[in-house]
């Protein structure tokens, strides 16, 4: 059983600064970290490894220079995966969901897999598209919002999803792509033994050419800025008579 768990390196939001002059966001001092939602996918994959005989977990990511960071690679491997594959290319530096999904699908095909796990979204964009797009590109079943994995066999994965008014149980034929929610587990903090052992695990570094990836047309990012601050008018209407109600309705109409 070959399980791939996908993750994304994102800027640490605590270190993102706002430029007061134009509201643009400054990422220059923000270190890269594993997207918080992907920690749940990594944990879920490693828990499955304990259930499936001879299962192997491969962590997979596509991106830019952030993936060259040795500390970041060690952090991923210390959380349980057996190996790491990173696809590094300048074109993935600010990749949007379609481009990311296309590259992940190509890399997964090259690596081989029975099951792909993703987080529900990334901490930076949170588009919630990549997992489903990977399934569509590979033409295999894809399910998102999974809150519990019930069982795994050689050819079927059984999961639960918490819907608005009910709990849905699904049996998914493998190979498949599953995007897990944050309800599925609480990611463990790696032990010192796991951190030291991570340095001995294999890491494969691929380029876009290695996975046969051709760039796809994508929207280019022009600017990322914080929303402009608006001064509140602080209009207080006192009383409950008809005049006050009419004034309240008139003020509502102005902002709708």
UniProtKB/Swiss-Prot annotation:
InterPro entries: ET-Flavoprotein_bsu_CS, ETF_a/b_N, ETF_b, ETF_beta_N, FixA, Rossmann-like_a/b/a_fold. Keywords: Electron transport, Transport. GO terms for molecular function: electron transfer activity. The keyword Methyltransferase does not apply. Gene3D superfamilies: HUPs. Required for anaerobic carnitine reduction. May bring reductant to CaiA. PANTHER family: ELECTRON TRANSFER FLAVOPROTEIN BETA-SUBUNIT, PROTEIN FIXA. Heterodimer of FixA and FixB. Belongs to the ETF beta-subunit/FixA family. This is Protein FixA. It comes from Escherichia coli (strain 55989 / EAEC).
């Amino acid at each position: 059983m070959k399980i791939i768990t996908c993750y994304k390196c994102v800027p640490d939001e605590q270190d993102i600064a706002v430029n007061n002059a134009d509201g643009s966001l400054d990422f220059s001092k923000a270190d890269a970290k594993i997207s918080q939602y992907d920690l749940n996918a990594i944990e879920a994959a490693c828990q499955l490894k304990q259930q499936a005989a001879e299962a192997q977990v491969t962590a997979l990511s596509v991106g830019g220079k952030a993936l060259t960071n040795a500390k970041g690679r060690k952090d991923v491997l210390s959380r349980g995966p057996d190996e790491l594959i990173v696809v590094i290319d300048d074109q993935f530096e600010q990749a949007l969901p379609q481009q990311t999904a296309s590259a992940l699908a190509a890399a997964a095909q090259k690596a081989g897999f029975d099951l792909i796990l993703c987080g529900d979204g990334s901490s930076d964009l949170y588009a919630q598209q990549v997992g489903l797009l990977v399934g569509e590109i590979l033409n295999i079943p894809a399910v998102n919002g999974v809150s519990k994995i019930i069982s795994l066999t050689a050819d079927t994965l059984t999961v639960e999803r918490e819907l608005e008014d009910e709990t849905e149980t699904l049996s998914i034929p493998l190979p498949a792509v599953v995007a897990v929610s944050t309800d599925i587990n609480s990611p463990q903090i790696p032990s010192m033994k796991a951190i030291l052992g991570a340095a001995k695990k294999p890491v494969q570094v691929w380029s876009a050419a290695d996975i046969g990836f051709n760039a796809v047309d994508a929207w280019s990012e022009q600017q990322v800025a914080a929303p402009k601050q608006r001064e509140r008018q602080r209009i207080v209407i006192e009383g409950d008579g008809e005049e006050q109600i009419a004034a309240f309705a008139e003020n509502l109409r102005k902002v709708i």
